């Protein structure tokens, strides 16, 4: 950390300056000299740097010197490497690094030693981009250790191929320092050969060889153990040990054959068409064949493409044509499919094989004009039997080797979406011999069926007598919208590009079962009518789904048309699915005991027991018709299981009918300890239900029930937190004797709150609130004077006055805030927008950021919807703002499609750590207001995002003041006109606002008086609109380049410093003239004060002269309470959460 030291000097070079400095205050002198130091440091950073080589034999060799601050200096050779030499050589236009030396060939340098311990990767653009100790810092180096280099611009280097019959094949030889030498074959491969061929302009590399295949050379062996990536411009630019360093002899000389020296060509012989037949290759003037060992569709695809017949129909082994003769040039060809020529695929050395000519390879290709694919007999072009027509022959696809991946490829090729169903049609044995297409397999990503590998075509026999049939989605898909948990919400179906809702009278239990199964959400739990999940907007489909319940997709259900206008959005149907496809107990002695396993996305996995409790177990036993939960054995009581261990945390109360009804969280879930999987032992009595326990046992004297066991009854005392904005914060309420009631705050403290939080699975208590912090409750006040020791498993096990014994009122209702309470916000020092900034999560009593690893647009959409900030957004680059003192809580958040809150998304476990702004997530959600159907972005129909959907504004009372607020909010110029009566067309969805009465100076439309959200008697023919000037009212500063910015800053700083100094000097001069007497003795006793900057410019909290020496340094630790600041709160999902955070700050501030 930078410090200032005050030094008293006995002498000074200028009496006049000394005399005036004496009269300046210490603070003024400190500021002036501090600014001066900053000016000098800034100037150093902006100084132009230069590099040169001195005292060498030519411009590409010599001692390395760097110029900075107009002063030349040297570089110490500590850690000097060939990587650093490569950087210097490239920087100076001498691209070939020859040698790294401590320059002893000439006189030592002089002046500064600017750099030491230089460490380069080799790809830096300048030497000063490499790591080093710092400018002017070195470890006692002298100029005897000055670093030097020897480079080459290539003009003195040559390469040739010899003894190969032409200039593009043969033994590699390099001329260096006037002498020809060879290259050792150690680690020599096709990448090296590619560099050689490219450098000699001989085309691509066909083959390489070692062991002096082109004869032994003579002279030096210049290179050994070369490392090339294939992109180098010259062989000597590959990494190497150094010129002339090797452990080889000339029996290991390397050679290459390039395409221009191989006389290569490919042809088809003896085929029925121009694109079929036996393959032959010409190599070094002679034709030969290819052996069929390993010959497959990838190899055929390369050959066909090379021959100008781009689609490979069949890869033929033991080709049905007259046998070839002559050489067998290639064997064991293995192509990836993207190579430009067959000989560029992997293969044995040219001419080496283990074949004879009855194994010659061939192909049947097509130019695509004679290939056709279609679906017939299914009622539309996107359903039916798969038919293919190849070279004018019509055939079917045999279902042998046929599956959903292959069907997906067909649907995609035909523009019919994805495959919903694949089946087969049985034919008689007589019809089985036909033209058939056989597929080995598709990976599902191909753009057409012809791209799938190893397919065969012809008059073959389909052993199964079955032809493939497909039903495609045709871009028709369902979804659930607006639910609080995944797999629940309003039913919407997409036809083409349009989403629409479904009337509750048109959706049966069978249809809901199909929907849940299609969405991989398990089984249907309930069907809810009356727009339970909110009203949709847009289309209401006038069709009844007549499913039987066994269909795999909703699109496969028959539909019956309904008359239009018979339904409204107030009757939109909703569905709740179980989310989990299946849930089961395994490895137990009976079906009603065992390890808990969930099936999600067709994969079974065990459930972690870190949050598994008896309430969760009760619900599972009931769902499986196994009575009630008797115990939840810990550890791997029924075995560890295989596959994934699900970290999802259920939060059941014990009264739910299905596990899908319980809230679930996944964000920040810890990795499951080895072997810690959930288990349960149910009573097994399928007719048994949970009866009410004797309420007399629920008093303070009730014995503690171990968490791993429970009585087979529902305790009358259920517990919940109300009005806190989440399940882990709020007013404490207990269900007792048929009524919900509260707890009085007398003696209410953290020990009591700990029991509540632990009982609810919400971690530990952060705050125990009183005075009806979360609002006054109703009904009985059940408990008073709670005195928990903090270890009880239920709040009613604590000592108290007894049930209903109290002298309180509801203004004394107790509440809690637990560590598992979570909230979300976007915050930025540079923006007041609540919908833009750094993504932060409130957890364990503190705000922390969210990492940007694997952050996707889907996850951003979940965040923006959760915050009520439109339905999507974008990820921004790291903010340039100063990073605030805040840790990172969680990283690797990966939301799938479906969750409505970030809490339901998997992530890395909670871990508090420091993070740079570049590691954090910065988001800007789309504007919650937009203008639609206008000629420009600043005119059109006004639409607002609210409650999870877009809606319009009614034109009642709509005027220019309202329009002015809209224009300002959208960043447009002043309002020109406020339109009524759907000037830009009628919108869809809700009419969110009516009777808007702005003054014109509000910052947003929702700050204006209006009727309650969604309360309107208007129709869309009254949609309001605006026309704004298309001139932005937001000032966007012009961005200067880095160099311009630094120069401008330095110039301004210099002018300011000069002005300050002149003003101070004149002021002090005037004061001196006004003095009546001056004691020369006193003046001589005055000492000068000089402030020296010891390291770098000061931070404000480092000025010892301006701060009391008694101030203590702040701890670097992040105390949870210290991280909560009222001044930085933003609204978070409602007033309740804001109240929680405000109270937490107040409580922690009093500690």
Swiss-Prot record:
Cytoplasmic compartment spans: 1068-1151
GO cellular component, one term: extracellular region
Extracellular topological intervals: 46-1046
Membrane topology of this protein: Single-pass type I membrane protein
Pfam family, one: SRCR
InterPro entries according to UniProt: SRCR, SRCR-like_dom_sf
Signal peptide segment: 1-45
Transmembrane segments: 1047-1067
Keyword Transmembrane helix on entry: yes
Quaternary data: Interacts with CSNK2B.
The protein's name: Scavenger receptor cysteine-rich type 1 protein M130
Organism: Chlorocebus aethiops
């Amino acid at each position: 950390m930078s410090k200032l030291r005050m030094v008293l000097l006995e002498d000074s070079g200028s009496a006049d300056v000394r005399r005036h400095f004496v009269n300046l205050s210490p603070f003024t002198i400190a500021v002036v000299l501090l600014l001066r130091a900053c000016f000098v440091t800034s100037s150093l950073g902006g100084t132009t740097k230069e590099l040169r080589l001195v005292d060498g034999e030519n411009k590409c060799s010599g001692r390395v010197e760097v110029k900075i601050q107009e002063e030349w200096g040297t570089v110490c050779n500590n850690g000097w490497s060939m990587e650093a030499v490569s950087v210097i050589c490239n920087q100076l236009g001498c691209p070939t690094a020859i040698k790294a030396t401590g320059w002893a060939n000439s006189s030592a340098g002089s002046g500064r030693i600017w750099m030491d311990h230089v460490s380069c990767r080799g790809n830096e653009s300048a030497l000063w981009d490499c790591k080093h100790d710092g400018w002017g810092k070195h470890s006692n180096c002298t100029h005897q250790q000055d670093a030097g280099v020897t480079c080459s611009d290539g003009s003195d280097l040559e390469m040739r191929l010899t003894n190969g019959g032409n200039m593009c094949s043969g033994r590699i030889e390099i001329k260096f320092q006037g002498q020809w030498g060879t290259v050792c074959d150690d680690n020599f491969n096709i990448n090296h050969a590619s560099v050689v061929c490219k450098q000699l302009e001989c085309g691509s590399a066909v083959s390489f060889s070692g062991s002096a295949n082109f004869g032994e050379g003579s002279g030096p062996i210049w290179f050994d153990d070369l490392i090339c990536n294939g992109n180098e411009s010259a062989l000597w630019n590959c990494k190497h040990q150094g010129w002339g360093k090797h452990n080889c002899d000339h029996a290991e000389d390397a050679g290459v054959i390039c395409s221009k020296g191989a006389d290569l060509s490919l042809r088809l012989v003896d085929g029925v068409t121009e694109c079929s037949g036996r393959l032959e290759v010409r190599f070094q003037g002679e034709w030969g064949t290819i052996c069929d060992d390993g010959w497959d569709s990838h190899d055929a695809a390369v050959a066909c493409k090379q021959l100008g017949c781009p689609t490979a129909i069949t890869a033929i082994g033991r080709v049905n044509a007259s046998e070839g003769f002559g050489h067998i040039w290639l064997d064991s060809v293995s192509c990836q499919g993207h190579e430009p020529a067959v000989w560029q695929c992997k293969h044995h050395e040219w001419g080496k094989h283990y074949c004879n000519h009855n194994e010659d390879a061939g192909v049947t290709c097509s130019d695509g004009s004679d290939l056709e694919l279609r679906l017939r007999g299914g009622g539309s072009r996107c359903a039916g039997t798969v038919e293919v027509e190849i070279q004018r022959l019509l055939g079917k696809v045999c279902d042998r080797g046929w599956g959903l991946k292959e069907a997906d490829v067909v649907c995609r090729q035909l523009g019919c979406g994805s495959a919903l169903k694949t089946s087969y049609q049985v034919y008689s044995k007589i019809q089985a011999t036909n033209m058939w297409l056989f597929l080995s397999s598709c990976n599902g990503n191909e753009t057409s069926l012809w791209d799938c590998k190893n397919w065969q075509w012809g008059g073959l026999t389909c052993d199964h007598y079955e032809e493939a049939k497909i039903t495609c989605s045709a871009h028709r898909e369902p979804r659930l919208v607006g639910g609080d948990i995944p797999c629940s919400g309003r039913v919407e179906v997409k036809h083409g590009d349009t989403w629409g809702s479904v009337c509750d009278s048109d959706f049966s239990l069978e249809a809901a079962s199909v929907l849940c199964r299609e969405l991989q959400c398990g089984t249907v739990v309930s069907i809810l009518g009356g727009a339970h999940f909110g009203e949709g907007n847009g289309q209401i489909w006038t069709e009844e789904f007549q499913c039987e319940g066994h269909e795999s997709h909703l699109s496969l259900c028959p539909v019956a048309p309904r008359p239009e206008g018979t339904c409204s959005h107030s009757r939109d149907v909703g569905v709740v699915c179980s989310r989990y496809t299946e849930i089961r107990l395994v490895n137990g002695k009976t079906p009603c005991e065992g390890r808990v396993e969930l099936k999600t996305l067709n994969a079974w996995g065990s459930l972690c027991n870190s949050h598994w409790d008896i309430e969760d177990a009760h619900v599972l036993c009931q769902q499986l018709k196994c009575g009630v939960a008797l115990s939840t054995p810990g550890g791997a009581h029924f075995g560890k299981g295989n596959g994934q261990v699900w970290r999802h945390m259920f939060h059941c109360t014990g009264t739910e009918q299905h596990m899908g009804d319980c809230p679930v969280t996944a964000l920040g879930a810890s990795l499951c300890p080895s072997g810690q999987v959930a288990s349960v032992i149910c009573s097994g009595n399928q007719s048994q239900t949970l009866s009410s326990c004797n309420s007399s046992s629920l008093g303070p004297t009730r014995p503690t029930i171990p968490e791993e066991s429970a009585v087979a009854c529902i305790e009358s005392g259920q517990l919940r937190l109300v009005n806190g904005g989440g399940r882990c914060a709020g007013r404490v309420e207990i269900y007792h004797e048929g009524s919900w009631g509260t707890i009085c705050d007398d003696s209410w403290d953290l020990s009591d709150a700990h029991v509540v939080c632990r009982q609810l699975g919400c971690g530990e208590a952060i705050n125990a609130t009183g005075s009806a912090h979360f609002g006054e409750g109703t009904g009985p006040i059940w408990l008073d004077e709670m005195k928990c020791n903090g270890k009880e498993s239920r709040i009613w096990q604590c000592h108290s006055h007894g049930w209903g014994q109290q002298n309180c009122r509801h203004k004394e209702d107790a509440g809690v805030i637990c560590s598992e309470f979570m909230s979300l916000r976007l915050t930025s020092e540079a923006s007041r927008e609540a919908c833009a900034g750094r993504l932060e999560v409130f957890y364990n009593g503190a705000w922390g950021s969210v990492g940007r690893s694997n952050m996707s647009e889907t996850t951003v959409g979940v965040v923006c919807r959760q915050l009520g900030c439109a339905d999507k957004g974008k990820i921004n680059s790291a903010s340039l703002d100063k990073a605030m003192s805040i840790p990172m809580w969680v990283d690797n958040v990966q939301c799938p499609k479906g969750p409505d809150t970030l809490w339901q998304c998997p992530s890395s476990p909670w871990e508090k750590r420091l993070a740079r702004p570049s590691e954090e997530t910065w988001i800007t959600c789309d504007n919650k207001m937009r203008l639609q159907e206008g000629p420009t972005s600043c005119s059109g129909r006004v639409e607002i995002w609210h409650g999870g959907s877009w809606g319009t504004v009614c034109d009642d009372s709509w005027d220019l003041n309202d329009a002015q607020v809209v224009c300002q909010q959208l960043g447009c110029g002043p309002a020109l006109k406020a339109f009524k009566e759907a000037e830009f067309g009628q919108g869809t969805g809700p009419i969110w606002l009516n009777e808007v009465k702005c003054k014109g100076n509000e910052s947003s439309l929702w700050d204006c008086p209006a009727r309650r959200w969604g309360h309107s008697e208007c129709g869309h023919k009254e949609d309001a609109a605006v026309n704004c000037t298309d001139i932005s009212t937001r000032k966007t500063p012009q961005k200067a380049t880095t160099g311009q910015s630094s120069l401008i800053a330095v110039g301004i700083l210099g002018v300011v410093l000069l002005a300050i100094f002149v003003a101070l000097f004149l002021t002090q001069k005037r004061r001196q003239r006004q003095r009546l007497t001056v004691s020369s003795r006193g003046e001589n006793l005055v000492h000068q004060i000089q402030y020296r900057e010891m390291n770098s410019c000061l931070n404000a909290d480092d000025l010892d002269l301006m701060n009391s020496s008694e101030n203590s340094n702040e701890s670097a630790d992040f105390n949870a309470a210290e991280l909560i600041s009222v001044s930085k709160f933003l609204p978070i999902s409602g007033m309740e959460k804001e109240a929680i955070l405000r109270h937490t700050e107040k409580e922690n501030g009093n500690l």
